[in-house]
Amino acid sequence: MRPEKLDAAAIAEQLHRMEGWVLAEDGGSIWKAFRFKSFAEAFAFMTQCAFAAEKLNHHPEWFNVYNKVDVTLSTHDAQGLTELDFKLAAKMDQAAEGRMPDHMK
């Protein structure tokens, strides 16, 4: 079953609960920049997120350089944001806990 695209009010409500996630200018995706203590921590984060993404059958667009992981989430089938994006965002936030230096949270 195809996920349903969220309306602006539902997106705003979801974002209000999420720390650090930003709505893209076009309203069709959310993004967050994660910074870790080391490359190993960034890679461990990505590995944990990859397993979560597989379970949800929803995959991020991400970019990694050393200790930085920039993530963009959207649901291409719905041409916008769905509950899947916010579920994966929450899983990513959980995976990042304890891996990021306090000054980078």
From Swiss-Prot:
Q: Which family does it belong to?
A: Belongs to the pterin-4-alpha-carbinolamine dehydratase family.
EC nos: 4.2.1.96
Lyase among the record's keywords? yes
Give the UniProt keywords, A-Z: Lyase
Keyword Lyase listed? The answer is yes
Q: Can you tell which superkingdom this protein's organism belongs to?
A: Bacteria
Query: Which species does the entry assign this protein to?
Result: Sinorhizobium medicae (strain WSM419)
Q: This chain belongs to which protein, by name? A: Putative pterin-4-alpha-carbinolamine dehydratase
Molecular function GO terms recorded: 4-alpha-hydroxytetrahydrobiopterin dehydratase activity
Please give the biological process terms from Gene Ontology that the record holds. Answer: tetrahydrobiopterin biosynthetic process
One Pfam short name: Pterin_4a
Question: Which Gene3D superfamilies did the record assign?
Answer: Transcriptional coactivator/pterin dehydratase
Instruction: List the InterPro entries hit by this protein, alphabetically.
Output: PCD_sf, Pterin_deHydtase
UniProt cross-references to HAMAP family, sorted A to Z? Pterin_4_alpha
The enzyme's first-digit EC class, named in words, is: lyase
Catalytic reaction equation(s): (4aS,6R)-4a-hydroxy-L-erythro-5,6,7,8-tetrahydrobiopterin = (6R)-L-erythro-6,7-dihydrobiopterin + H2O
